[in-house]
UniProtKB/Swiss-Prot annotation:
Keyword vocabulary terms for this entry: Ribonucleoprotein, Ribosomal protein, RNA-binding, rRNA-binding
Keyword Ribosomal protein: yes
Source organism of the structure: Thermus thermophilus (strain ATCC 27634 / DSM 579 / HB8)
Protein name per the record: Large ribosomal subunit protein uL14
Keyword Zinc: no
Pfam family, one: Ribosomal_L14
UniProt GO MF annotations: large ribosomal subunit rRNA binding; structural constituent of ribosome
SMART domains per the UniProt record, alphabetical: Ribosomal_L14 (SM01374)
Higher taxonomy: Bacteria, Thermotogati, Deinococcota, Deinococci, Thermales
Coiled coil: none
Subunit relationships: Part of the 50S ribosomal subunit. Contacts protein L19. Forms a bridge to the 30S subunit in the 70S ribosome, contacting the 16S rRNA.
Highest taxon, organism lineage: Bacteria
Length: 122
């Protein structure tokens, strides 16, 4: 469950390390984002010479959450951190690599490029 003011790790190689959620882009009045939801975020920590700088406002898709995700078969999955991948306006990843596992729910939401770049899909 990601809400405004939540800090997330960045799971790609765009140069950002931490982002802070500003807005959840899901419906008109959504309070929380979960895996596969798009958020608007501000870059709070970045490495020098990266594709994004501190203070940039970016769109990102949530790929891991500490709050468990319940699946239709009754199982649940949760991760050790909250993480996102920075995307462009066409919902394609801006980076060329994705670090760490991502949830299977991304495939159902149409983020196939992120799923194919990820080393592991859980």
């Amino acid at each position: 469950m990601i809400q405004p003011q939540t800090y997330l790790e960045v799971a790609d190689n765009t140069g950002a390390r931490k982002i802070m959620c500003i807005r959840v882009l899901k419906g008109s009045n959504a309070k929380y984002a979960t895996v596969g939801d798009v958020i608007v975020a501000s870059v709070k920590e970045a490495i020098p010479r990266g594709a994004v700088k501190e203070g940039d406002v970016v769109k990102a898709v949530v790929v891991r959450t500490k709050k468990e995700i319940k699946r239709p078969d009754g199982s649940a999955i949760r991760f050790d951190d909250n993480a996102a991948v920075i995307i462009n306006n066409q919902l394609e990843p801006r980076g060329t690599r994705v670090f760490g596992p991502v949830a299977r729910e991304l495939r159902e939401k149409g983020f196939m490029k992120i799923v194919s770049l990820a080393p592991e899909v859980l």
